[in-house]
Amino acid sequence: MNHSSNEKEPETIEPLRYLSKTEVATVETELLRDYRFGQQQLIEIWGHACAIAITKAFPLSSLSKKQPTLLVVCGPEQNGSIGLVCARHLRMFEYEPTIFYPKRSTLGLHQDFTVQCEKMDIPFLSYLPTEVQLLNDAYNLVIDAILGPETDHKDVKEPYAGMLVTLKQVKIPIVSVDVPSGWDADEPAKDGINPEVLISLTAPKKCATGFSGKHFLAGRFLPYDIQKKYELNLPEFPGTECIIEL
């Protein structure tokens, strides 16, 4: 069968780009400085998208325990605040989050997120049980919002080093925000926690190359010029969704 010479060639789909730590920092600086996004605004966008991803991966009807309990473990910097926002939205979606936030940030914008959770009567744990079975029995899953891409994975201090030891042993699923805690953002981990779900923010990081679990991307807010400049090749999000499963 002859094909006409003006028949369109199939479009080449460029592969999704995985960013290095340095590129992540550069993109975020550009968003804040040149595009006038606020840091609190970005944290809210990301936290809300994380909550949506969790509802997709673990719908209320799929949870094994009678109560839809979740444990959100928050670190001291931006990832921790994203965890706080995620917990607040999950509460609105009728889950029952509990937060463990051992070193609260002194920055006003992070404190705002803490107050919002407290005002919604989301409980805060005073300590993380080291007896893993207590966590397995009490919660359906753990949300790891401890350490972000900027963290030096070789220099994780207490209490976070001890928390990672505990989380490595839990039997319930772990959902990691952006970068699984304890991983180097630039390369897949040889040792570290093993999340069942990863939610990449803005664009996936190099460490997520070959990630075998369920992988979501929350990045449907990036100005097109930034997407083009960094050749991110983001996938087409379905409908009006703010997340996509990769």
From Swiss-Prot:
Gene Ontology, cellular component aspect: mitochondrion
Protein keywords: Lipid transport, Transport
GO biological process entries: hematopoietic stem cell proliferation; lipid transport; membrane raft distribution; negative regulation of angiogenesis; regulation of cholesterol efflux; regulation of Notch signaling pathway; sprouting angiogenesis
YjeF N-terminal domain: residues covered: 24-234
Domain of life: Eukaryota
Phenotypic consequence of gene deletion: Morpholino knockdowns have a reduced number of nascent hematopoietic stem cells in the ventral dorsal aorta between 28 and 60 hours post-fertilization (hpf). Morpholino knockdowns show increased levels of free (unesterified) cholesterol.
Keyword Transport: yes
A GO term for molecular function: NAD(P)HX epimerase activity
InterPro entries assigned: YjeF_N_dom, YjeF_N_dom_sf, YJEFN_prot_NAXE-like
Subunit organization: Interacts with apoa1a. Binds to high-density lipoprotein.
Function comment: Accelerates cholesterol efflux from endothelial cells to high-density lipoprotein (HDL) and thereby regulates angiogenesis. Orchestrates hematopoietic stem and progenitor cell emergence from the hemogenic endothelium, a type of specialized endothelium manifesting hematopoietic potential. YJEFN3-mediated cholesterol efflux activates endothelial SREBF2, the master transcription factor for cholesterol biosynthesis, which in turn transactivates NOTCH and promotes hematopoietic stem and progenitor cell emergence.
Stored NCBIfam families: yjeF_nterm
Designated name of the protein: YjeF N-terminal domain-containing 3
Source organism of this protein record: Danio rerio
